[in-house]
Amino acid sequence: MEFGLSWVFLVAILKGVQCEVQLVESGGGLVQPGGSLKLSCAASGFTFSGSAMHWVRQASGKGLEWVGRIRSKANSYATAYAASVKGRFTISRDDSKNTAYLQMNSLKTEDTAVYYCTR
């Protein structure tokens, strides 16, 4: 009985930690090669304005690939991009909405992937 209560307590703690930070992506869809798409990442549970935000992606059957990042206002909102997307993708952010964006233009078939934001 004592073990069971401890286990339930541990699960409750882990669930609480898991829910502390939330990053919710939206805006995905199907587009033709050459098209455009804008993804959004709504953040909560941490100080968004002071955090760098990154985008990564994972194509089917492949590992994670870093796409790019945007730093905080204190770091002049500096951006950096993977060579594969530079000049086509643009990362921006709206600190008042706790949201980061990934504008993807001139899309290629090789851009097909699941996209994630992270901090």
Curated annotation (Swiss-Prot):
V region of the variable domain of immunoglobulin heavy chains that participates in the antigen recognition. Immunoglobulins, also known as antibodies, are membrane-bound or secreted glycoproteins produced by B lymphocytes. In the recognition phase of humoral immunity, the membrane-bound immunoglobulins serve as receptors which, upon binding of a specific antigen, trigger the clonal expansion and differentiation of B lymphocytes into immunoglobulins-secreting plasma cells. Residues 80-117 are annotated as: Framework-3. This is Immunoglobulin heavy variable 3-73. Its main location: secreted. Disulfide bonds join C41-C117. It comes from the Eukaryota. Residues 20-44 are annotated as: Framework-1. Residues 118-119 are annotated as: Complementarity-determining-3. Residues 70-79 are annotated as: Complementarity-determining-2. It is found in: Secreted; Cell membrane. Keywords: Adaptive immunity, Cell membrane, Disulfide bond, Immunity, Immunoglobulin, Immunoglobulin domain, Membrane, Secreted, Signal. Immunoglobulins are composed of two identical heavy chains and two identical light chains; disulfide-linked. PANTHER family: IMMUNOGLOBULIN HEAVY CHAIN. Residues 1-19 form the signal peptide. Residues 45-52 are annotated as: Complementarity-determining-1. InterPro entries: Ig-like_dom (IPR007110), Ig-like_dom_sf (IPR036179), Ig-like_fold (IPR013783), Ig_V-set (IPR013106), IgHV (IPR050199).
